[in-house]
């Protein structure tokens, strides 16, 4: 019997353990909130905002990982054009969705795709669709596409009295392009589709609009949504300028979650200001952004208010690490060879990928492949030249280095930014 996307796949589940680890290694910090809202054991569709190309689904996989029922995704069809890529994506439990830009003759194929998606949800497997249909390079929610709501309405009809939920998920990043930023995954209250099923049976277009109207504010409340389009850059910069003051005002911790809450609060407050007051905020934000650009410091770092004590401890950690390696000829070789992984993951996206939105995703893909090959090759070399124990130890250290080496480089980057700010 042919397996479907909803069926259990042992090899995929084992592979996902590796990808989830690499996802953790890709970020300095991943903050998850609202996990109590996930309706495990029920039928549900995950509806995240789409902020950062491939990294959004990788964060969803990491946060919603279930060994028995990994998440199934729907993605735009244009990435499935090459047969080899299509085979890989299908194995990764990703199915295509066709849009008008793919050709009107292709739209008819969505009926089969939507039927498959409905079967996935009916079997109790989480289904994920990016609510906006395309990623955005700004902290703004784009208009939601209706494909998800068509699947939800038809599935709820099939389920009858059994509930189907749409789970809104907000995603936020300190920085889109580079690795070792911090990420926030914020799950909201699930939306019960039974509330719309009667209208769906009577007038589907109206029901689809009602579902969209329910999901849109839910998502905006879970992410940092900058409402202004014309003055986006100024408002976004102002949110970072006022982060520390807002942390003190709201008695929030100066950490990833606290700063995210502060920035979101500032945007909500700005929406209530008069036009004259907002213009003043925009001017302050523009001046702050100009100052950061002049010093070569990103907004997210400028808003952290890193202290000299933290910088001092970073120096201590770096010196201790180098000293530890210097007393061991074996680990010195390991450190040098580790650059074989670190350098390609940073240089190739920076100089070869023109679209900034895909640089982090390409970095992730290179890291996933190169780290596996590096660990395998180095383990074999050390096993042959140094013996079994050395080969085993270097394998373990290589896997661990995938996590703490980027953290060390990120700390070093913090020190660099700190001195750029005070000079």
Positions of PLM-derived features:
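Soluble catalytic domains of membrane acyltransferases
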Residues: 5-19, 23-206, 215, 321, ...
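Membrane-proximal, non-transmembrane alpha-helical segments
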Residues: 270-349
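Long, charge-rich alpha-helical interaction segments
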Residues: 213, 217-303
């Amino acid at each position: 019997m042919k397996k479907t996307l909803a069926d259990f796949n042992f090899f995929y589940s084992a592979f996902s353990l590796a990808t989830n680890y690499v996802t953790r290694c890709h970020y300095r910090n991943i903050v998850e909130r609202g996990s109590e809202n996930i309706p495990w054991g029920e039928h549900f569709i995950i509806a995240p905002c789409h902020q950062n190309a491939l990294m959004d689904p990788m964060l969803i996989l990491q946060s919603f990982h279930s060994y028995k029922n990994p998440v199934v995704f729907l993605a735009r069809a244009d990435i499935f054009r090459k047969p080899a890529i299509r085979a890989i994506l299908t194995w990764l439990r990703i199915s295509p969705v066709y849009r008008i830009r793919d050709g009107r003759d292709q739209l008819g194929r969505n009926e089969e795709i939507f039927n498959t998606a409905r079967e996935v949800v009916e079997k109790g497997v989480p289904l994920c669709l990016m609510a906006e249909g395309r990623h955005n390079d700004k902290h703004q929610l784009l208009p939601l596409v209706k494909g998800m709501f068509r699947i939800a309405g038809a599935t709820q009809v099939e389920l009858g009295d059994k509930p189907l939920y749409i789970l809104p998920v907000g995603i936020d990043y300190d920085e889109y392009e580079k690795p070792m930023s911090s990420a926030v995954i914020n799950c909201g209250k699930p939306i019960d589709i039974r509330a719309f099923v009667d209208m769906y049976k009577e007038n589907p277009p109206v029901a689809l609009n009602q579902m969209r109207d329910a999901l849109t504010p839910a998502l905006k409340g879970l992410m940092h949504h900058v409402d202004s389009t014309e003055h986006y850059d100024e408002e976004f910069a102002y949110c970072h300028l006022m982060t520390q003051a807002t942390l003190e005002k709201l008695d929030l911790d100066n950490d990833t979650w606290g700063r995210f809450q502060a920035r979101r609060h500032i945007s909500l407050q700005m929406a209530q200001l008069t036009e004259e007051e907002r213009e003043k905020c925009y001017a302050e934000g523009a001046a702050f952004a100009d100052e950061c650009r002049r010093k070569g410091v990103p907004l997210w770092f400028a808003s952290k208010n890193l202290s000299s004590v933290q910088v001092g401890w970073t120096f201590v950690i770096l010196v201790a690490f180098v000293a530890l390696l210097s007393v061991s000829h074996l680990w010195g070789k390991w450190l040098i060879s580790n650059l074989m992984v670190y350098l390609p993951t940073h240089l190739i996206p920076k100089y070869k990928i023109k679209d900034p939105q895909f640089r982090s995703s390409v970095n992730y893909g290179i890291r996933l492949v190169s780290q596996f090959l590096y660990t395998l090759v180095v383990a074999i070399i050390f096993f042959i030249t140094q013996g079994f124990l050395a080969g085993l130890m270097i394998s373990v250290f290589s896997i661990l280095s995938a996590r703490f080496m980027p953290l060390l480089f990120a700390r070093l980057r913090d020190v660099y930014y700190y001195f750029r700010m005070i000079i």
